[in-house]
Amino acid sequence: MELKLLNDQGQSSSNVAAPDTIFGRDYNEALIHQVVVAYQANARSGNRKQKDREEVHHTTKKPWRQKGTGRARAGMSSSPLWRGGGRIFPNSPDENFSHKVNKKMYRAGLCSILSQLAREGRLSVIESLSVDAPKTKLLSQKLKGMGLDSVLVITDSLDENLLLASRNLPNVLICEPRHADPVSLVFYKKILITKLALAKIEEMLA
């Protein structure tokens, strides 16, 4: 598999060879869906909480007498049937949302995503990407000159200037190869990988 190699200005200079075992796999939609759903589920904090009728603080006084009013009988205002009452089946923070995906499947899912991105022309390799100062304007102008408005940049190491310059750009994410997740790879329109980061990805997914 040949990937497009860009220079510092974002212009195509040549191609770089990439292993077919990572960037030449077939598109496996079911596996990608499983990996993405598992990643999102495992990222949940699981702290949602609702109160049942025992936990809602209401008076235990009977709202009205049992018979003779013409209204439906009622015991207390914390009943789940009432507005402001407790939930019948409340959510509790001890719920487990985690999905298990073994390492082999997770890596295969990442390879399938990277292969599809390469086929669609959304993935490119760049010599390096840096800015002279931690200024959002500098990085924004640089990416705009490359025609990139939504991009995930995978670098071999986090450059402080680049990281600080990207924090205020909503459609730009800078990360290392070990932090490249399936959700981000699918979400961003373009993926830029530095040459050194490409070697790390090959080593990680080999």
From Swiss-Prot:
The keyword Chloroplast is assigned to this record: no
Keywords attached to this entry: Ribonucleoprotein, Ribosomal protein, RNA-binding, rRNA-binding
Database matches in InterPro entries: Ribosomal_uL4, Ribosomal_uL4-like, Ribosomal_uL4_dom_sf
Composition skew (Basic residues), residue ranges: 59-70
Matches recorded under Pfam families: Ribosomal_L4
Gene3D superfamilies named in the record: 3.40.1370.10
GO cellular component, one term: ribosome
Gene Ontology molecular-function annotations: rRNA binding; structural constituent of ribosome
Disordered, as annotated region: 43-78
Segments of skewed composition (Basic and acidic residues): 49-58
Biological process (GO), any one: translation
Presence of keyword rRNA-binding: yes
UniProt xrefs under NCBIfam families: rplD_bact (TIGR03953)
Annotated family: Belongs to the universal ribosomal protein uL4 family.
Quaternary structure, from the entry: Part of the 50S ribosomal subunit.
Protein role: One of the primary rRNA binding proteins, this protein initially binds near the 5'-end of the 23S rRNA. It is important during the early stages of 50S assembly. It makes multiple contacts with different domains of the 23S rRNA in the assembled 50S subunit and ribosome. Forms part of the polypeptide exit tunnel.
Protein name, per record: Large ribosomal subunit protein uL4
Lineage: Bacteria, Pseudomonadati, Pseudomonadota, Betaproteobacteria, Burkholderiales
Gene that specifies this protein: rplD
